[in-house]
Amino acid sequence: MTHIKTLVAAITGLSFFSAPAFGQTYTKNQIGMAMMRTNTIALDHGKIKSGHNSVWAHLRGDFRMSEVNPELVRRHESKFVSSSAYFKRTIERSRPYMYHISNEVAKRNMPAEIALLPFIESAYVTKAKSHVGASGLWQFMPATGRHYGLEQTPMYDGRHDISASTNAALNYLQYLHGLFGDWTLALAAYNWGEGNVSRAIRRAQAAGLAPTYENLNMPAETRNYVPKLLAVRNLVNNPHMFGLQLPSIKHEPYFRAVTVSAPLDIIAAAHLANISESEFLALNPAFKTPVFIPKENRQMLLPVQAANTFEANYRESDPKTLLSWDVFTPTQRISVADLASQTGS
């Protein structure tokens, strides 16, 4: 019988702010904001060379978050500079995803800093998993992911879907911003949970304090969360000031979605696109099986040129040669024994 496979920074350099009058001092926050003005002026005067078509130039044009806990920001800047190999490696890893993420952030008129959040969450590792079960670029917990429409099955994990998870994360962040009215508090809630932040706000208000990020009693991870993001923002904003060089990433799509009408082997899809299987999986990490099964909320993503190649080859291909598995879609709950009986496995 034929066997049937069944798919059941120490900062040096320029100074652009006036010296204080005799006896005048600056607060740490004023110093932090002065550093941001330094970055902006350096950009305006061409100190940072970046083409207009660079994704970094577009990000810099929409950085807008004020600094919080400047002493922590400075500390994380120094750490990233001293670990420059890690910083460069992580930024390079963002290459396939940065345009898409930054473009989606810009469409929603969100601060450009949000596009750098996966640096903190996952280091742009699409299948990163935390010890508590969060997973993906945006580190969704299973329940939160499902709440924001990310399907999770034995065959597919939407938390690893680049497009779907980015959309879900931005929806979640916009909800949190609407709830708290402040991006630093929204980010704190993304990390710590909205209930925890709400309770911390009430405790601060009961103590007569303004409900700001700096005034909330938070765990160390959340206390450092936004300062760490702002440190990454500052390094991206003015890499030369920190002795760094960012990889050139064009402000244009790296990938696009293609439509398929029937299941096909992942290796066949890669072959039709003239790319390696590893290149295919880098953009489609949500799939846990060797078959791509089209569904309304799932997309196949391919590098732009490869997408054109795929579509041309897909139109000319024989569908029978693209799938080496039998795909069984049950219409109701079924036991493994019954499934084996029905499929002859």
Regions found by a protein language model. Give the residues of each.
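Substrate-binding clefts and substrate-entry loops adjacent to catalytic sites
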Residues: 75-88, 124-131, 139-181, 201-216
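Extracellular LysM carbohydrate-binding repeats and other cell-envelope/extracellular binding modules
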Residues: 283-316, 344-345
